[in-house]
Amino acid sequence: MNYLTLAIGTAIILLFSWYFSIREGRYHGIARFFSFESIFILVLLNWRLWFKDPFSGFQIISWVLLIASIYPGIAGYLTLHKKGKPEDNHIERTTVIVKSGIYKYIRHPLYCSLLLLGTGVMFKDPGKLQLVCGAVNLLAIYFTARLEEKEMIKKFGPGYIQYMYETKMFIPYIF
């Protein structure tokens, strides 16, 4: 692993986390930092094997997860941007609870996307360190979602609590 690349990437992720969440008191950005960081480390560990042995079981699982990560990420972002009435065009500053599109089924499509992405990158070469990074990503995403839900309850009150009862976190009808 190239440690200079790791240091530069980590600095960028820290700045992103600070600018878009933490500085405004949205502390779910701290947990989300660990998700971004674990995915970044997984990419650094596995990039050389991205296309090696493309028909192995792990590669097939990896590509299915990577491709599956695209839809919830794009659909979630576009729906938040269009329906969330964000202040200053910033999706973390939505002014209404979005309950349409993919948000009709899951509350956290962007985090679902990160979950699928991180797991897909991990499956490129699922060694011990990669499994640890994959577990960190899973835990970080779960805690990010829980922290964000507390923030949304403060912001939107009982309406968000009702929305939580109507939808699942990451997987429609399951979890």
Identify the meaning behind each predicted range.
Residues 90-110:
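Active-site-proximal inter-transmembrane loops
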Residues 109-117:
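Hydrophobic alpha-helical membrane segments
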Residues 1-96, 116-175:
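Membrane-anchoring alpha-helices and their flanking helix-loop junctions
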